[in-house]
Amino acid sequence: MGNTLDSNKPKNFVTYADYKYIGKLNNKNEHHGIGIILYNSGESFYGSFINGKKEGKGIYIDKNLTRYINTWVDNKVFGKVKVVPYNSNRVYYFYYKNYMIEKCIYFDNNINNKESHHKNNIYNNYDNNSYNNNSCDDEEKRKYPIGVTKFKEDLSNYIHSTHIMKKNNKLFNKNDNEYNIFSSSLSYSSDSENINLLDILKKKKNKKNKKNKKKKNKKTKNTQILSCTQHKMYEHNMNESNFTKKDNVNCEHTDKMNISLHEKNDKKNEKKNEKKNKKKKLFKYFSNNIENLIIENYQTWSLREVIQWLMLCNVPVKWLISFYKNNITGDKLKYININTIRNELGIIAYGHAIKILQLIKNLQVMAYNKKFNNLIQIEEYKNYIRQKENTNKNIKKGKNIKKEKKKKKEKNIKKEKKKKKKETKKFNNMDKKYIDLAIHKNVKNIQNDTFYNKHENIYNCKNQTNFIYQNDSEIKKIMNKKKVSFEYDNNEEKKKKNIIKFIKNNKSLQNSNGEYYLINHLSKGICSDSIFYKSSQSKSSSQLSSPLSSPLSSPSPSSSPSSSPSSSPSSSPSSSPSPSSSPSPSSSPSSSPSSSPSSPPSPLSYKDNFPISSSCSSLERLPSYEKKLLSSSQSNIEHIKNLPLDVLSNNNSSANIKIKKSKSKYNNDKKEQKKLPLILNKSSSEFSPSHSYTSKSYHYNIKPSLQSSSNNSSDSSYSISSTCSSSSSYVSSLYSNRSNDILNFYRNKIIKYCNNIYMNTKLAYSYMNGFIIPHEDLIFIHPIENYYMDNTNEKNNINNPYTKEKIMNHNFSFNTKNNTSFIDINTNIFSSNKQQNINNFGKYKKMKSRMFKGKYMGKEVAIKILVGKIKNFKKLHQILYNLYNLRHSNLVLIMGVSIHYPFVFIIYEYMKNKCLFSYLHCIKYKHVYISTFLQRYKTLLHITQQEKIKKTNNINNNNNINHNNINNNNINHNNINHNNINNNNINNNNINYNKDYNNKKKKEDEQHNIEHQDTFIDLPEKSNISSDDNNSTDISQIQKENFHFLNKKIEENKNIIYDDHTSTLSDHSIHNINKSYDNVYKNKMNIFHYQHNVLCGAYDNNDNNINDNDIYCNNIYDNNINDNHIYCNNINDNHIYCNNINDNHIYCNNIYDHHKNTSLNSKEQNTDHNIEQINECNKYASETKYNIKKSNLKNNIISHKNFQKCNQIQMNQPYTFPPYQKELSSYLKNEKIKRKRKVLFSYLKTHIHFNSQQINDQHNRLSVQKIMKIITDVTLACTYLEKEKMSPINLKPTNILLDESLNAKISDFGISKIENCLDMNIDYSYKISSNSVIKINKKEYEQKKAKKIKIVNKNNNDLLYLYDHNNNVYKYNTQYIDVTYNNSYPSIFYWTPPEILRGKKNKKFYSDIYAFGIILWEMLSNDIPYNYPFASHIMAVVGYANEELSFNNIPVSIQSLIKACVNRNKYKRPTFEHILKTISTLYQKANTKVEDALISFMDGT
């Protein structure tokens, strides 16, 4: 038989309208003999026929891979029917008479998994007896006596031992020459000679007995020799050994020799034990001396201490040597980067370099946490937070009182305006000398007076003060703009009182809008910054200075009163503990204590012209936090206890922290001035980045400039993916060449969540914590998907030279190169015409995968997703440790593992050529990423033409109303009842959907939808598009090239109706996009981006759950549950239904319902007739449930069987096969059986990618040398894993990855062991029914302030919208992942061996060797073997029938190896060691031929 159905057709191959037949025929071309029927709907049948009718035993395989085994008589079912589901160990038996079912029996035992072995070969005359072994019942198996079963077990054990042991193996001899000759005759043929296994077992037992006798003889000899004395020796007869008399001298000689031998052996053993004890002592010494290594002061470590730390981390010896040679101490650990590790230390592997950096990261996190714990006590800080909450309440009460006062003040201000006008005239005529004298008399330490213009920034150096020279004309313009203030010194209060008296006498200094106060802060002859403050009241200074103390923090001697500067408009309010600091070179702080809060400041009027962009303070931020903590002394801990973390980050070398609290009275006009800053003084003259927070939006601006943030509402820029976990707050820049990266932004997390401080000293020494990666550091870009073609028609074959010049179009049809080459992959692969799918079996197929392309620390990474809850952490850590120890050049490097319930992410290195399957067969495509700038560009484009669209919409709406009224009569109300939902709101939505659907149907052929411009655009071919290597494109190029293209497209589609819900450019409306876009980036502690960037959901296959009342409670969901955009993209035909009827691989929402009634042939019938049948099925199922519930009360339990009786159930259609699916479905619903469930994995929408598919010339066949190179790499890796006992390897063509130079590497080994540690019964955060109705767990999402979740099905991919209470939208990309409950039942594909297809298990390497043979055939023939569209066809053809591979274009020397690997008897398959020997000989032969050819070419012969 051939590889495909059409390329290599056998002789007896007949195609019909509904199925295809492969087998024997009569003279009348009727089915006669053994044959296979492959139905176009996905089912298959294997059995015997007589004159076109089914007779004898047969196996019917469903779409769900459930096997129905029974006997047929005249094309009718006779006797009992055995039902074997694929993913469960339960077996059902249906007994019936006269077309009436009498009873049903099921077995829960694992009898079918036990393999039966016979004396003769099972596969001799398989055509006649292929189904006897599989169709035997459990009752018949139990008839065998106990001795027969033991004999079979002995046979299986012997066969397994012969497969492993080379000495006893007669199939594979020692010599290679004998192996090649002998194996071709025996092991490479499926029909081998019979072996007398009884004789072999007898020989084996005799050998064992002989070995045991020899051992006993040796023991007796040793005892006799040692027991001999100087006296005469006597003869002893023990085990046929004769001892004669000997002399005393000989006896003494033998005694000495034996004693000396024992002494030598004892000494050797003692030395070995001493070495072991020394190693144990050293390990105990280092483990006990963990306390000697002070983690806090790791920067002061010597070389010895660094090596001691690495030894405790269980690092390889090569790393220790490289650290020792380069003399790396604790100071150098901070400056280590990837380049230094690879170039200087000599550790070239990128993965190993990252793991070293992860160890250093853990050490620094532990050091920071210890230092932080010493400085701050958490209990006292909780009291601080409580006080802060009380102040917030008091402030709210104070605001209401202020409003009443404002109204009274406004009346008084109008009366005083006349008086103030007179005072302003006097103030304008005042000279500058009064102010200059007032300053110069009272400030002694000013050495240089610097004057600046109004457009320059103000900055201070040591022993200098800065103030602005101003003219009288300039003062008039600036009086109402700024507040400025000076700090004042406590030691010079007397001199300031004189200034206050001088100002009180001169009333002309008063301004119309308020008073100016001047405060000078002097300390040890050094003047600090000058900050000007303007008060809001016209009262005297004594009244203003009284309410200075604010309840922000507990009173401390370091607190000094001051006024709030107006120069920093982004200053934080009093409720926030974070300071608003603006960068400027600062002067050295004062060591003298500040004044008491009761002492009032001295007011002094002053004039200033202060630019908006300028700001000055005495703050500067050090690049790292660790230097500050080391310099701080223990005496300052009492001052620091009650301060927030951001205040501590600005700590001084002298550790004298001074807080300036703002006054409690504010200006009436400006709301920005209501925010109180917390300002610190520091001693350094370097520039520092601005660090300003607000209550609504936390700004984090990293700019080495002197400008402060302009507005409170300005957009804050920060990275979405965090680079530190919740336990770590500060990590230096290990992974970049920069050394001054500032990450103090995340320190606030530890303070807000005080209990999350992870104080475990083992963190610094544990390597596994470096291997386990936080999920926040992972970025998911897109799933790795492979699409390939069915070679059913030679016209559509990729390898055909006629199709090489053609390119795929949007509808998967071939066109010339002039057309576009972009394809929307995630749409339905199959065309809307069902007849084409029936004839072609579906042109394109998709490989299911759980792999994603992502990024980790800026490096491209492949991420595999596993679903489940971890049962045993100890086993999982052991498995991960064993995987880490596996080191081979042909194994894919595992970067790490991250755990985020309910997912387990395994991170691999990314290979650019992807897997071998995609390199050979799949369609080549590129990914283009477009940034958010292009989104805004499209919104602006949309807004400009929105007016034109509205005009066309108004015209179209009038025309569509009449058209919809006509179509309403043709709508069947059964479509609504089909969803099992009785709410009136939902019914109305379904009717409206049918109206819109009929309107849009006519326009699909003429025009394209603009609804999905955001996710997919058909760009012209001339545009320069970056490949998968470059993850970003130049937006300017795309903008220039595609601007004209987009305008044309919008003009063509003017007549399309735009809805707020369906358009991708707007979630609610275009006006609200900018608000939702900005709000995503404003929130600092964003739960959706940081803590929950990965969500989880599960599809519930039961339709009964849709009618639950919990779905609609508390108005969590919209009334419009079935929006128009939910179904508009998935429905292409009237034959498709929302409840996921298995209809030619077209499913709504990609949900696979295992227990639906598949006996309905919806293809051949109309929609009305199908709906009637579905309603009948539901009624019938409800009746059977009632009967079964009655019968459950009368269960009869028999000794060793689970026996269940039922009432007689009448069969509606006795002659159509299978007639018992309704009855089986009723049992399955009552019994909780393990079954597949789909999980909706959702990740953040970081990029918009377009899938551009182009067929390249890489589909040509690989050369023989490249094939041999790939095969040798695979065999080397498999032999290494076989020695390490990592079974099963899970070898597949999709798990073989290729480099740029086509070096093969194996992945996914050991994942089956990890899955055994997982529990698939998960408490999902939300569930999705078949109607895409979402059910949320309230407790979890109410805490997160999530309002609702909605799925929007798009052409490109399904998006999940998550709404806040503020109606902010967060978009998530989604992917459907199958959750398998039993790992022993793998997915079926063309590489699965026949024993697994028949329902058995393989715990050894047998299945991997079978897959190896198919991979070799696949590479040599450049074709897919057993390329059938359905898994049931593969199960029937490969599992039960004897379809063989064709070896037309494959060399003869390799054919024998492939036949051995693909042998149906798994015990006759070779091991990987034997495969290596054969490949080495073949590789040498191939090289000799090439060398001979070269020599002959050079010689000219």
From Swiss-Prot:
Glycosylation-annotated residues: 64, 128, 133, 239, 242, 258, 327, 448, 463, 471, 506, 652, 681, 712, 737, 811, 819, 1024, 1031, 1074, 1157, 1382
GO function terms (MF aspect): ATP binding
Keywords: ATP-binding, Coiled coil, Glycoprotein, Host cell membrane, Host cytoplasm, Host cytoskeleton, Host membrane, Membrane, Nucleotide-binding
Coiled coil: 399-433
Cell location: Parasitophorous vacuole; Host cell membrane; Host cytoplasm, Host cytoskeleton; Host cytoplasm
Domain Protein kinase residue range list: 1088-1483
Low complexity composition-biased segments: 543-597
Name recorded for this polypeptide: Inactive protein tyrosine kinase pTKL
Oligomeric form and interacting partners: Interacts (via RVxF motif 1 and/or 2) with phosphatase PP1C. May interact (via SAM domain) with SERA5 (via C-terminus).
Mode of membrane association: Peripheral membrane protein
Organism of derivation: Plasmodium falciparum (isolate 3D7)
